[in-house]
Amino acid sequence: MDPDKEDKTLELMCSLPRSVWLGCSSVAESLCALRCLQSLPSSRAHNQNMTGMESQINTDEVSPKKTTVFKLGNGSLAGSRKRPSQGSFDKEKDLCIQLFDQWSESDQVEFVEHLIARMCHYQHGHINSYLKPMLQRDFITALPARGLDHIAENILSFLDARSLCSAELVCREWQRVISDGMLWKKLIERMVRTDPLWKGLSERHQWEKYLFKNRTNEVPPNSYYHSLYPKIIQDIETIEANWRCGRHNLQRIQCRSENSKGVYCLQYDDDKIISGLRDNSIKIWDKQSLECLKVLTGHTGSVLCLQYDERVIVTGSSDSTVRVWDVSSGEVLNTLIHHNEAVLHLRFCNGLMVTCSKDRSIAVWDMASATDISLRRVLVGHRAAVNVVDFDDKYIVSASGDRTIKVWSTSTCEFVRTLNGHKRGIACLQYRDRLVVSGSSDNTIRLWDIECGACLRVLEGHEELVRCIRFDNKRIVSGAYDGKIKVWDLQAALDPRAPASTLCLRTLVEHSGRVFRLQFDEFQIISSSHDDTILIWDFLNVSSNGQSDGRSPSRTYTYVSR
């Protein structure tokens, strides 16, 4: 601004009443008001009339006939030029547009910036309302028009089911992108990859054959997957309700033989159940027909623990030995003789095996192959039989009849800490991530944080020794010498605000003897007992007459020893 003009502006500004120039919301409005006032009659005459003008402004009693007064966006008043006639305005506007079109893009932007700077807040609001929809772009529609369909599909593939339903209703082009991109199929595939429940349902209902295939001639249209998704959700809700209400179908395998007085351990997969019995044998059962496929013999004592993978079965016995068997042939591949008394529990994974014994020791083994197993370290510290072990890459966890849980480093085998709290010996535990869940002959279940050793919760409800326990992300399932299996809400148990009375979801009563071992997944529990039975509690395929009181109709399969 020219110095002389700036001085005149400041002089005029100082001569104005405060109610005029302080009422402006911005410098732009102030300057606008000043320029309008400068267009009035001479400053001397103007100054003589200022008192009257201020009175008019303060009372808002300005005659609408006076063209020298206008209202600013903030409500204050100032003078303005009279608008030219419509014809003159149109000519001037057309001339401005012609000049504007001749300028470069940068000059046009600079000119518009100058215009906006001279406007009031009220005008800014109008311009903002005009520009906002122009700045919004439908990129999902625009991308396919540029041959970038795959990018639009990839963006929409991150939506969850509810958002994907809404996206289909936006417009026909969005619906086409979702359909052509098979986004419902991709959503189901993502859930199957990340959620065990979805994976299990896909296998059991056999719609997995329509997934993970890229050829269009091998898969149904997108509408098939769109209609499949709510059916899957309905199945999941039904399964959850069955768990909470105790609705299930029951299948029973009778394992009685002349010398059998209990099924001490088991493990299962989709095809088979492998069990260890008190009669020194290992029996392999077909999971569909429930018929005994094979009997493995060799131990001279009860088979107390076992674990298998796709190649080998490893068993521990009261005869103090650990045996390694070929899954396919049933032949003994290796026999480990180390412990002085019964081998009570064992775990193996990723080339490492840990066994524990009634002799109070824990043995850590390097397992290069079924025939190449060497003792790495013996862990000593418990003052009674070590009943159970579990481990991961960080910790080995052991529990004993001495009422303690001990934590050891997996890599160095050095002692880390002791978890104290149970009032009597500990019979079972499971360890995963930071959580340890243990069951004891004090009839309680305890949840522990392994990193700090704190007891997070005590679950009470069993009437006798808690013999076996397993947990997943949702629930804890425990079996006890009272013959009962209890299902607990894990997430509620980890919440200190949850009342103790709400933690046990259901008690299942079907065994007539002590429950020795159990395993479960999203759809079923399989348990074994002193009553010589293996029970399969199915929460997926529930018949119409399935009961919700913990007992349900069952079909029985009897194995007769020859």
Swiss-Prot record:
Primary location recorded for the protein, binned into one broad class: cytoplasm
CDD domains in the cross-refs: F-box_FBXW1B, WD40
Subcellular location: Cytoplasm; Nucleus
Homodimerization domain D as annotated region, ranges: 87-136
Listed PROSITE patterns: FBOX, WD_REPEATS_1, WD_REPEATS_2, WD_REPEATS_REGION
Superkingdom classification of source: Eukaryota
One annotated GO molecular function: protein dimerization activity
Cellular component per GO, a single term: small-subunit processome
Positions annotated as WD repeat: 256-295, 296-335, 336-375, 379-418, 419-458, 459-491, 508-538
Deleted gene: phenotype: Knockdown of both fbxw11a and fbxw11b results in abnormally developed pectoral fins and heart edema by day 3 post-fertilization (3 dpf). At 5 dpf, knocked-down embryos show periocular edema, small and misshapen eyes, and abnormal development of the jaw.
Record-linked InterPro entries: Beta-TrCP_D, F-box-like_dom_sf, F-box_dom, G-protein_beta_WD-40_rep, WD-F-box_domain-protein, WD40/YVTN_repeat-like_dom_sf, WD40_repeat_CS, WD40_repeat_dom_sf
Pathway(s) of this molecule: Protein modification; protein ubiquitination
Pfam families in UniProt: Beta-TrCP_D, F-box-like, WD40
GO aspect biological process, one term: sprouting angiogenesis
Keywords: Cytoplasm, Nucleus, Repeat, Ubl conjugation pathway, WD repeat, Wnt signaling pathway
Ranges where the F-box domain occurs: 149-187
Subunit text: Self-associates. Component of the SCF(FBXW11) complex.
Domain note: The N-terminal D domain mediates homodimerization.
Task of the protein: Substrate recognition component of a SCF (SKP1-CUL1-F-box protein) E3 ubiquitin-protein ligase complex which mediates the ubiquitination and subsequent proteasomal degradation of target proteins. Probably recognizes and binds to phosphorylated target proteins: the interaction with substrates requires the phosphorylation of the two serine residues in the substrates' destruction motif D-S-G-X(2,3,4)-S. SCF(FBXW11) mediates the ubiquitination of phosphorylated CTNNB1 and participates in Wnt signaling regulation.
Name of the protein this chain belongs to: F-box and WD repeat domain-containing 11-A
